[in-house]
From Swiss-Prot:
Keyword Ribonucleoprotein: yes
GO molecular-function terms, A-Z: rRNA binding; structural constituent of ribosome
GO BP: translation
InterPro entries hit by this protein: Ribosomal_uL4, Ribosomal_uL4_dom_sf, Ribosomal_uL4_euk/arc_CS, Ribosomal_uL4_euk/arch, Ribosomall_uL4-arc
Pfam (any one): Ribosomal_L4
Keywords: Ribonucleoprotein, Ribosomal protein, RNA-binding, rRNA-binding
RNA-binding among keywords: yes
HAMAP family noted in UniProt: Ribosomal_uL4_A
Protein name: Large ribosomal subunit protein uL4
Subunit record text: Part of the 50S ribosomal subunit.
Family of this protein: Belongs to the universal ribosomal protein uL4 family.
Domain of life of the native organism: Archaea
Gene name in the database record: rpl4
Source organism: Sulfurisphaera tokodaii (strain DSM 16993 / JCM 10545 / NBRC 100140 / 7) (Sulfolobus tokodaii)
A single GO cellular-component term on record: ribosome
């Protein structure tokens, strides 16, 4: 199936929020958004990080317990001699598990290579769609999507400077939304290094790695930074929901164009 896609144009912003140039977007920013594929590929990427777990084959079985038999007025569960304490059976304290987890369990959701590529393209297209970005809950005042800025942004070294850029681009409201919604996690996860639940805010897609910029941007709540060459559905559609508020550098668009354009025919 082939679709007629219209090439979109957009502006490039400087660090003060002024429009400095107009460019044609790669064709994949016009692709239809396949939410079903994005969800499947997100699950696939997410499950790749899961660690297989099992149980000690002898867990709950290190006992000499045997059933006392019948006609004693007792349940016929295995019992420890002399004490009569029930053991070994799944319904007893300290007994074995009836169906323990096994390391052989298949954890990863498998998807085809072309489906994975199409899902990333769909997620990229959603970042250029005002409806998807707003429906995801992001708050911003800018009227142009996707947001593309000059490459000089990666030279910034201070968190304060990056915040000023976000304010000039009229997207800092989304960071404030994240701040207001940070909350303590329920359950035991708060004791295991996952104390706070933090919503996802703006995503920076950059063309080259600059550790100083990455660290400065990561200090801002909800903000993530990723190389265009490493971009995946995990970053573009957290939770499998497309339409993350994304800020691209000018050169990152060229990297994405080389990576995806002309690879798929619809």
């Amino acid at each position: 199936m082939y679709l007629e896609l219209q090439i979109k144009k957009t502006h490039i912003f400087d660090l003060k929020g002024n429009k400095v140039e107009e460019i044609e977007l790669p064709i994949f920013f016009s692709y239809p958004v396949r939410k079903d594929l994005i969800r499947r590929v997100f699950i696939s990427e997410f499950t790749k990080a899961l660690q297989p777990k099992g149980r000690d084959p002898m867990a709950g079985k290190r006992t000499s317990a045997l059933s006392f038999g019948i006609n004693l007025g007792l349940a016929r569960v295995p019992r420890v001699k002399t004490t009569g304490e029930a053991a070994l059976a799944p319904n007893t304290v300290g007994g074995r598990l009836a169906f323990p987890p096994t390391v052989e369990k298949k954890l990863v959701e498998e998807v085809n290579k072309k489906e994975k590529k199409l899902a990333i393209i769909s997620a990229l297209s959603a970042t250029a769609n005002m409806n998807f970005v707003k429906n995801r809950g992001h708050v911003f005042s800018i009227d142009t999507l996707p947001i593309i800025v000059v490459d000089d942004i990666t030279k910034l070294t201070k968190t304060k400077e990056i915040i000023e850029v976000l304010e000039s681009l009229k997207v800092y409201e989304d960071v404030e939304r994240v701040k207001d919604r940070i909350r303590i996690r329920s359950g035991k996860g708060k004791m295991r290094g996952r104390r706070y639940k933090e919503p996802k805010g703006p995503l920076f897609v950059i063309h080259e790695n600059n550790p100083v910029f990455v660290k400065a941007a990561s200090n801002i709540p909800g903000v993530d930074v990723i190389l265009a060459s490493d971009l995946s559905v995990i970053h573009l559609a957290p939770g499998g929901h497309p339409g993350r508020l994304t800020i691209y550098t000018k050169s990152s668009i060229d990297v994405l164009r080389k990576r995806f354009e002309g690879r798929l025919a619809l």
